[in-house]
Design a protein with these regions (language model features):
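Short, conserved beta-strand element in jelly-roll/cupin
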Residues: 140, 147-165, 213-216, 221, ...
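A structural signal for short, well-ordered beta-strand segments and their strand-loop junctions
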Residues: 52-54, 121-124, 155, 169-172, ...
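Double-stranded beta-helix
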Residues: 163-229, 251, 271
């Protein structure tokens, strides 16, 4: 019953009022400082199709990100409501602070290294906010949503606060080959049947689920074949995340994009089905100093 009342878990504000906020120049430097992965990171991602990496971003940079996203949300949506899932796309084209986080070479290099590709382009950014009481995110994999003719697609999920289980962090099915287990289930977003079939299959097959909290500064990367979900936000605080999706340079748009792919022409303007996805809105994010 969706009207059933749940106890709201009260959390303190995500960031202390005493926190010293770094300058914009310091943030830019942090977001362009390379993060070197270890072999264990590559092995884990290769096996499981996702990875959570701690301490990628500082508490100061996340405080700035959260503040900026809150301003954007307040401009677009009425505030002080409950239960809603709010999203905003392509904010990097309008907001210079969000732009630094979306085009960050520190983050894009990690994504490229995990995919083991040399050049990576941006598909889009997506601000995702769950208000207090907002329900769970159904099981899905991103391959249905991006009309790209490549397996080299990856999304980084940057929570703009520490995200305990009660707040609804991203959760992942593992290893990545559970994709084969459910690939014949027809995707649909018109009802809950797809989500229920996936969940039932995973339960029957005793699939492992990584559903732990995200510490402050911890971010995740997941392949477009990775099945993931997120829980309900049972806290009194807004759960905010910035999700950026990247793909290998040279990838083409599939020949017959469907409605599931959404408004893909907004993200790859001027490119026809079968064409190379390299519009002005798909800059190369890694390596840096490469002409698009």
């Amino acid at each position: 019953n969706s009207n059933k009342k749940h106890k709201v878990i009260k959390l303190d504000l995500p960031f202390s009022k005493d926190l010293v906020i770094p300058s914009f120049d310091k943030i830019k430097k942090e977001l362009s400082t390379p993060y070197e992965l270890k072999e264990k990171h590559l092995d884990y991602f290769n096996k499981n199709g996702f990875i959570k990496i701690p301490n990628v971003l500082s508490i100061g940079s996340l405080a700035i990100l959260r503040k900026e996203i809150l301003l954007l949300l307040k401009k677009k949506f009425s505030v002080n409501k409950r239960n809603r899932f709010l999203s905003m796309e392509m904010m990097w084209t309008e907001n210079k602070i969000i732009r630094e986080y979306v085009l960050s070479s520190r983050i894009a290099k990690i994504a490229a290294d995990l995919l083991k590709v040399k050049r990576l382009r941006l598909y889009h950014d997506n601000i995702l906010a769950k208000e207090s009481g907002c329900g769970r995110t159904p099981w899905h994999c991103d391959d249905d949503h991006f009309p790209l003719d490549t397996k080299d697609v990856i999304t980084v999920w940057i929570p703009a606060q520490a995200t305990p289980r009660e707040m609804g962090p991203l959760s992942f099915a593992m290893p990545i080959n559970v994709y084969d287990m459910v690939s014949k289930i027809n995707f649909n977003n018109s009802d809950t049947s797809y989500d229920k079939k996936i969940g039932k299959t995973f339960k029957q097959q005793k699939v492992l689920i990584e559903n732990g909290p995200f510490e402050i500064g911890e971010i995740s990367f997941h392949h477009n074949f990775s099945f993931h979900t997120a829980g309900k936000n049972n806290t009194n605080q807004l759960r905010i995340a910035l999700a950026n999706t990247f793909f290998v340079d040279g990838a083409k748009v599939i020949s017959n994009p469907t409605m599931v792919s959404g408004d893909w022409k907004k993200f790859i303007p001027g490119v026809r089905p079968g064409g190379i996805a390299a519009s002005k809105l798909n800059p190369i994010c890694w390596p840096i100093n490469i002409k698009n």
